Amino acid sequence: MPIPASPLHPPLPSLLLYLLLELAGVTHVFHVQQTEMSQTVSTGESIILSCSVPNTLPNGPVLWFKGTGPNRKLIYNFKQGNFPRVKEIGDTTKPGNTDFSTRIREISLADAGTYYCVKFIKGRAIKEYQSGRGTQVFVTEQNPRPPKNRPAGRAGSRAHHDAHTCLSALPERNSTNYFVQPCCCLRLLGLTGLLSK
């Protein structure tokens, strides 16, 4: 009686095909698919990194990394670990699953970089089989801070501070309270002529 295929026991034909391709040196038949080459996101938002991995290979984990080489940073492991800002999109426990996409929330400027979805194969040791082409993430600051250009000298600094305070306190133009401001603020901002109109 044949043994039914499962993620732990792939179908015999696909295992034989994999072994034949390995022996022949053909390793680029299988592709880890990352659909987006680049994405732009603002700080504080979330981003989805897409990854599709065919289920025709022998068992082995899929991991997400930021960067390449020996200094690459592990971003997500679908099997174990604590990754508070990262969550998987697909159900990787479901037999036949091919979706290894992830969502990263609360993006910061430090999250800019290139992210890789990487397939490993279990053997005597876990061996990296193939990586996706990578998704480059650009991060823009949502509310950039204004530059601190204060005028020189004590009086100038005080005037700049008062002007900033007055400007930030002024309501919208369509507000009925637009001109109800302390006289010093109006004088400082050169708006005293508005009172006579």
Curated annotation (Swiss-Prot):
One of its GO terms (cellular component) is plasma membrane. Residues 31-135 form the Ig-like V-type domain. Pfam families: V-set. It comes from the Eukaryota. Glycans are attached at residue 174. Disulfide bonds join 51-117. Gene3D superfamilies: Immunoglobulins. Residues 139-158 are annotated as: Disordered. It is found in: Secreted. The keyword Glycosyltransferase does not apply. InterPro entries: Ig-like_CS_Receptor (IPR051755), Ig-like_dom (IPR007110), Ig-like_dom_sf (IPR036179), Ig-like_fold (IPR013783), Ig_sub (IPR003599), Ig_V-set (IPR013106). Its main location: secreted. Keywords: Disulfide bond, Glycoprotein, Immunoglobulin domain, Secreted, Signal. Residues 1-29 form the signal peptide. PANTHER family: SIGNAL-REGULATORY PROTEIN BETA. This is Signal-regulatory protein delta. It comes from Homo sapiens (Human). The gene is SIRPD.
